[in-house]
Each structure stands twice: as C-alpha cells, then as structure tokens.
A protein has these predicted regions:
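A short, N-terminal "cap"/entry segment at the start of jelly-roll beta-barrel domains
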Residues: 1-44, 127-137
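Conserved short histidine dyad/triad with adjacent acidic residue
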Residues: 28, 33-64, 83, 95-99
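Ligand-binding loop in jelly-roll beta-barrel domains
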Residues: 28, 96-122
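Residues that flank catalytic or metal-binding motifs in active/ligand-binding sites
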Residues: 31, 68, 107
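Short, well-ordered beta-strand segments in beta-rich or mixed alpha/beta enzyme
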Residues: 48-50, 71-77, 112
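Glycine- and acidic-residue-biased ligand/ion/polar-headgroup-sensing regions
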Residues: 58-80
C-alpha cells in the first residue's frame, strides 16, 4: 500500500477550516490537518498551524526516533532548541533523535511536516556514508 492521494485542494482556504483538528494538549494553541498518510508504514504529510501567541514551553521540547522534514509555509516560529526564529520559506531535514522545540509564535505559523515513523534505523547514503546536512558551495 502507499500514501493516500487526493486531487488539488486548498487546506488553507476559509471553507476548509472545519477540517483542522486541535492538537491534544495544545488546544487553543495549535491544530493540524493530515494531507496524506500511509496506513501501513505510518508515513504522513501534514500541516500544523500554531495560532498567534502560541507558546509550547510548558510542554518542553521533543525528539523522534525517526526522520522528518519541515517547511515553514507562513508566519514565523521560534524554536528554543536552536535559539532562533524560523521564517516562511525555511526548511529542515531532521535526523532521528534531533531535539526541537519548545516553540512559540507571535503572529502564527503554518508548518508543513513530512514524517517517516517507519524509518527508525540510522539512515545512510547510497555509498554507505552517514547522511549529513546538505553541502553548499
């Protein structure tokens, strides 16, 4: 089986607001909408929306045993683990075990997440070397 598919639609459109689900424990601060999921592997793509003024400091940071990719779609989000503001357009490919958060936002933020919970083993490059951050010239 593979990840679910769908035709074009706009999850950010006003008429789609009822599809956003409050994140348990973060009600009033953050909500999510799953865009695609593989029921066998658990791999998923979702949007997480942090509402203006959200602050998850009381919950601490987190890590996952699996890799994930994040892209800041809109707004800005402060990641305490990295001591920096993430602005719209920023991207990260997090390795398993990377600490991130807690988060806060002043204006709100939408984050695209692609997560791979089935990939808990250390990933390696095709030549057997460990994967690292993308190299720039």
């Amino acid at each position: 089986m593979s990840k679910s598919t769908t035709t074009y639609w706009n999850p950010l459109a006003p008429d789609q607001q009822t599809r956003w689900i409050p994140i348990k424990g973060l009600e009033g601060m953050a909500e999510e909408i799953t865009l695609s999921i593989d029921p066998v592997t658990g791999e998923y793509t979702r949007l997480t929306r942090f509402l203006p003024g959200a602050d998850t400091s009381a919950f601490g940071g987190k890590t996952h045993a699996y890799p994930e990719e994040v892209f800041i779609v809109s707004g800005r989000l402060y990641d305490h683990a990295f001591n920096r503001w993430l602005e719209a357009g920023e991207y990260a490919s997090r390795p398993p075990g990377e600490h991130h958060g807690p988060f806060k936002t002043d204006v709100g933020c939408v984050v695209l997440e692609v997560s791979f919970p089935n990939r808990v083993a250390e990933e390696s490059a095709p030549n057997g070397e460990e994967c690292g951050p993308a190299q720039t010239s």
